[in-house]
Curated annotation (Swiss-Prot):
Name of the protein in its database record: Histidinol dehydrogenase
EC number: 1.1.1.23
Physiological role: Catalyzes the sequential NAD-dependent oxidations of L-histidinol to L-histidinaldehyde and then to L-histidine.
Binding site for substrate: S233, Q255, H258, H323, D356, E410, H415
GO cellular component: a single term: cytosol
Reaction it catalyzes: L-histidinol + 2 NAD(+) + H2O = L-histidine + 2 NADH + 3 H(+)
Enzyme class: oxidoreductase
Keyword Transmembrane helix belongs to the record: no
Pathway(s) annotated for this protein in UniProt: Amino-acid biosynthesis; L-histidine biosynthesis; L-histidine from 5-phospho-alpha-D-ribose 1-diphosphate: step 9/9
Protein source organism: Bacteroides fragilis (strain YCH46)
Family classification: Belongs to the histidinol dehydrogenase family.
Example GO biological process: L-histidine biosynthetic process
Co-factor: note: Binds 1 zinc ion per subunit.
Length: 428
């Protein structure tokens, strides 16, 4: 961890830089795999699985028998926890349902919106160092609430061709339609273009490593929508002298254990807290099973001391963190001044872990500063809003002349004529 005290504004850009991974040949590699899958379908997907996941597969689909067997392997206490998380996620996302109302913009001119679910969506759930069954809930539950007809899930198998039981349990519970043993770039390509087994979808959701992220970016240029640009996960803790250093250190470490490219930041007005957090991080680090990962991640982490809360807020909004934890005595007032963040956790007893799993909010969030322009996944991510307008003769009489003038001044004669012929009919 790097301790920074009272940085000058000229240093902010350097201080707030995210970890950068080497990507010199990445896009060429990813593009090649995408093109191969697009041309060769299931055969190429299985070849990729053998190379990248060391799994020799004869079929890609997860069977009902496999799901039923997996459910038996999930411990009762984990099932209970998943049920609780599901209930809270459903409650929060159900409250986001759109209720469009008709608006009369003028007499005889009525406009409205209708929310329609995206019919086919694809969910990518990484394998890697941890089974992210929580991400299954975060993506499949709002998709189901939205009314998506087909929810396709791809996740990499282990070398024995098995998918983690908790992922399968969560997928069935959340209403996933089809599950496939496919990971990496090949999974994104398969969902973007379709194979003999895997349906083509209209929008792809889910996190992944730099290869998966690059694949999502490439297929989104023309062929399929994606949830958002994504990068390594990150957290900022914004704290004053009232914060508990044990809690702050725990929050920083909970982010650091995600991956070696994760970033954990503390921005504080208290030099005493900055010092105490360094001690607490070292103490708690010794208890972690993923200590090696956390230690490497902490190399990207910074503990920044600033002169006052005004500067802390300015620095925070410039950073635009994926996760922001506010541990100050007046956290509601401070929160009111946050304009750039993915998800905000207020007060000493609101750790990021709550949002990651079970509070009900979504943990699929914009990273890498994209919180300045993007929202996290919500019910809206799975729907489209179609606009409608009904114009009666009285409405056309009211707005028609203005349309004619505007079209004429844009030199679009056919646009003008489409109104003129109607006005002439009305005047008969």
């Amino acid at each position: 961890m790097k301790l920074i005290k009272y940085p000058d504004r000229s240093q902010w850009n350097e201080i707030l830089k995210r970890p950068v991974l080497e990507t010199e040949n990445l896009f060429d590699t990813v593009r090649n795999i995408i093109n191969r899958v697009r041309a060769g379908g299931d055969r190429v997907v299985m070849e990729c699985e053998a190379v990248f996941d060391k799994a020799e597969l004869t079929s890609l689909a997860v069977t009902s028998a496999e799901i039923e067997e997996a459910e038996k392997e999930v411990p009762i206490e984990l099932k209970a926890a998943i049920y609780l998380a599901k209930r809270n996620i459903e409650t929060f996302h159900s409250a986001q349902r759109f209720e469009g109302k008709k608006v009369d913009t003028m007499e005889g001119v009525t406009c409205w919106q209708k929310a329609v679910a995206i019919e086919k969506v694809g969910l990518y759930i990484p394998g890697g160092t941890a089974p992210l069954f929580s991400t299954v809930l975060m993506l499949a539950i709002p998709a189901k609430i939205a009314g998506c007809k087909e929810i396709v899930l791809c996740t990499p198998p282990d070398k024995n061709g098995k998918v983690h039981p908790a992922i399968l349990f969560a997928a069935r519970l959340a209403g996933v339609s089809k599950i496939f043993k496919v990971g990496g770039v090949q999974a994104i390509a398969a969902m973007a273009y379709g194979t003999e087994s895997i349906p083509k979808v209209y929008k792809i959701f889910g996190p992944g490593n730099q290869y998966v992220t690059a694949a999502k970016q490439l297929v989104s240029l023309r062929d399929v929508a994606i949830d958002m640009p994504a990068g390594p996960s990150e957290v900022e803790v914004l704290a004053d002298e009232s914060a508990n250093p044990v809690f702050v250190a725990a929050d920083l470490l909970s982010q650091a254990e995600h991956g070696v490219d994760s970033q954990a930041m503390l921005v504080t007005t208290s030099e005493k807290l900055q010092t105490e957090v360094v001690y607490e991080v070292e103490r708690q680090l010794g208890y972690l099973t993923r200590r090696d990962i956390a230690e490497k991640s902490l190399a990207n982490s910074k503990l920044i001391l600033v002169k006052d809360m005004e500067e802390a807020l300015e620095l925070t909004n410039a950073y635009a963190p994926e996760h922001l934890i506010i541990e100050t005595k007046d956290y509601m007032e401070v929160a009111g001044q946050i304009v750039n963040a993915g998800s905000v956790f207020l007060g000493a007893f609101s750790p990021e872990s709550a949002g990651d799993y079970a509070s009900g909010t979504n943990h699929t969030l914009p990273t890498n500063g994209y919180a300045k322009a993007y929202s996290g996944v919500s019910l809206d991510s799975f729907i489209r809003k179609i606009t409608f307008q009904e114009i009666l003769p009285s409405g056309m009489s009211a707005i028609g002349p203005a349309i004619e003038v505007m079209a004429a001044n844009e030199h679009l004669d056919a646009h003008k004529n489409a109104v003129t012929v109607r006005l002439e009919e009305i005047r008969k």
